[in-house]
Amino acid sequence: LPDPAFEAWRAGFIAKAVAQGLAEDQVTAILAGVQPDPHVLELDQRQPEFSKPISSYINGAVSAGRIAGGQARIAADHLWLDPIVNRYQTPAEILVAIWAMESAFGQLQGDDDVVRSLATLAAEGRRKTFAEDELIGALRILISGEAVRTQLKGSWAGAMGQTQFTPLDYLAYAVDEDGDGRRDIWGSAPDALASTANFLVKKAHWRPEQSAQIEVAVQIKAFDYTLVDGPAKAPADWAALGVTPVDPRGLPDPDKGVDAALIMPMGWQGPAFLAFPNHMAIRAYNNSVAYALAVGLLADRMAGGGPLVQPWPADQPTSLADRMAAQQALTRLGYYSGEVDGLLGSGTRKAAKLWQASQGLPADGYLSYALIQRLNAQAGTAATIPAAAT
């Protein structure tokens, strides 16, 4: 049976698409028979019960098999990859790392119908503007004939192709690298990687020759850890504060005059990095510190670099209940006034820094499982999910 709410959304969306210059009969035909995808709704609304430490994600991403696979692709595909690298001044290793992360070198592009996925997200309403704008982009691709509906397969969130472009990014940045007259990010690896390079340069402002991140160590005991995740500074200023590269050769020359932020994804006991503007360029592709670090570290290993000097600390996963209880504790203690949602974002990290400083702890903002238990004990909160969140 038709979903009345979805049908109301469909009618309103068709009117919006027509107002943006699309033909009503074409839009109606493409959307005919489209119904909400329960699978997409479930994935969009689900928050994992347990959050693995970032170390688990990065160790999985920067695996020996993926490093070797990337090196093999760079060697085998240099005839078409080298011209892309030269034209866009983006390293082959970065492009191939993104290719590996997004689709296992084109093998796993997702099989969800992009039109249906975006229609589902738009009608659900939580990300209506984003989903409707991207859906109009998908309609433009289909109406222009650049792709057919059976090609528009991708992730449940609407990303598609070998390097997982959204429809609007496809329209703006996809290129025809192999010269066959089509911007085929699904079937043509040269088109997909050239499109990614074009995106990194034009939208994300990739800086040639510069690093994405450099592993560093804090050389002084009295370091001010509130500087973690703070404003970027010149490497010389970081060095004056005791933050220096773990590589005894120091920073590569192109990085020496470039401001960088200090990040410690698992706190002061784990690896530390100077994150340069190219780290943020990767985050423009996928706005996740973990993703950008994984791409940068994977690229470094493909280029012959060694593993991290500072190992990741052993830390057990935290549950949604743990994280919500930590936010409740920070609220009760007067450090946090944001939403209790289990998402430990910048607001929670700032609050955690204040609490850590009050306890004489390194104020890096990272809440390990052990620290969450200590925080809860102090505030008298427990790891129970409020009824409103279940």
Residue positions per predicted region:
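Acidic, Ser/Thr/Pro/Gly-enriched interdomain connector segments
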Residues: 276-289, 297-342, 381-390
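Short acidic, glycine/serine/threonine-rich helix-capping segments at coil-helix boundaries
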Residues: 318-323, 331-375
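Acidic/His-rich structured neighborhood in mature extracellular/periplasmic domains
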Residues: 54-201, 212
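Flexible, glycine-rich surface segments
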Residues: 149, 153-161, 166-284, 310-311
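Secretory-pathway/luminal and periplasmic proteins that interact with or process carbohydrate-rich
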Residues: 36-43, 103-113, 124-128, 144-150, ...
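An acidic, Gly/Ser/Thr/Pro-rich helix-cap/linker signature
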Residues: 1-87
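Surface-exposed patches in mature extracellular/periplasmic domains of secreted proteins
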Residues: 22-31, 91-97, 149-154, 180-184, ...
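Acidic helix-start/capping segments at beta-turn-to-alpha-helix junctions
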Residues: 27-51, 99-103, 113-116, 215-223, ...
